[in-house]
């Protein structure tokens, strides 16, 4: 059997993603080397908290390790029950909210330092063989983030060749 909802029914009957308010402080040298990350997440789990603690935890536990070159990091959070529909599990399961905040902060850092955001990421992202402090000193034995980032950079540069510099930087 198959159940097909209209758009309105889907919005009424399904669970929303966890609403999160994220405060992030990013510390870096003038050359763009990230020295510290301080992330606080306030998560609205709705009226019931089946996924509340897990989801909010992933907003920091999946985003901070991407920049493992940082010498200091802190992740704190609160989960609140509200008079809203309970939030459910979706792809990314909390990580997407944290990643959006961290990547937005990296873009803001790049703008402030007048640097290419890809250059800052290349200098700071986790690489294969790196020790990952956020994962209790485990060694990263499998990671192709650097190659993925290089491919994205290539694809974006090819698609933005005919766009003016200020517009191109705003899009990246």
Question: What is each residue range found by the language model?
Answer:
Residues 1-164, 168:
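Structural alpha/beta core scaffold segments of enzyme domains
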Residues 170-172:
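Short, ordered, surface-exposed loop/turn motifs in non-cytosolic proteins
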């Amino acid at each position: 059997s198959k159940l097909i909802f209209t758009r309105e029914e889907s919005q009424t009957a399904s669970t929303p993603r966890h609403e999160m308010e994220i405060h992030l402080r990013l510390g870096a040298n003038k050359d763009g080397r990230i020295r510290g990350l301080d992330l606080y997440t306030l998560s609205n789990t709705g009226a019931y908290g089946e996924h509340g603690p897990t989801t909010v935890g992933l907003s920091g536990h999946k985003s901070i390790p991407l920049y493992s070159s940082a010498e200091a990091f802190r992740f704190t959070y609160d989960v609140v029950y509200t008079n809203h529909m309970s939030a459910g599990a979706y792809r990314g399961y909390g990580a997407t909210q944290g990643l959006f905040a961290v990547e937005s902060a990296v873009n803001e850092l790049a703008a402030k330092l007048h640097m290419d955001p890809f250059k800052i990421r290349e200098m700071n992202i986790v690489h294969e063989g790196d020790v990952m402090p956020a994962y209790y000193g485990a060694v990263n034995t499998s990671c192709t983030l650097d190659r993925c980032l290089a491919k994205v950079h290539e694809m974006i540069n090819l698609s933005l060749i005919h766009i003016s510099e200020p517009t191109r930087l705003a899009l990246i």
